Amino acid sequence: RKKKNCFSAVTLWHVLEHINDPVKELLFIKRLLKKRSHIIVAIPNTSSYDNSYYGKYWAGYDLPRHRFHFNPAAFSKLCDKVGLKIKSTIPMYYDSYYVSILSEKNKQSIFSFIKGLYIGFISNLKAKKTKNYSSLIYVLEN
């Protein structure tokens, strides 16, 4: 028997970008939720400064494991398509450091740790104005 309306919340911490069909998956999860329940999604943000800085070396792309890539506008369209409301967006401040360090390693950079920390800091500083942090947490309501 398929369960319906049995959960108050479902979390997807850096999961959605790995799924072959995000629309199908979100619709499936939505059926599992009670009314006015939440899906919490954390995903890399392709509109972040660290992405524009690193380009093809940006670790947030994580090809081929990441099947999809989102910025806030694309994620909002996805949510509209499946009938979910974005209730809030929360920055993941530490992801810019982690992703930048990995991106420096992708570039085979000398002092990748120090350079990554610096670019991660700059990314967060710029995101204070743009709200485009390296990764974002979306709280969705059905």
Language-model features: locations:
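Active/binding-pocket-proximal capping segment
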Residues: 57, 84, 92-93
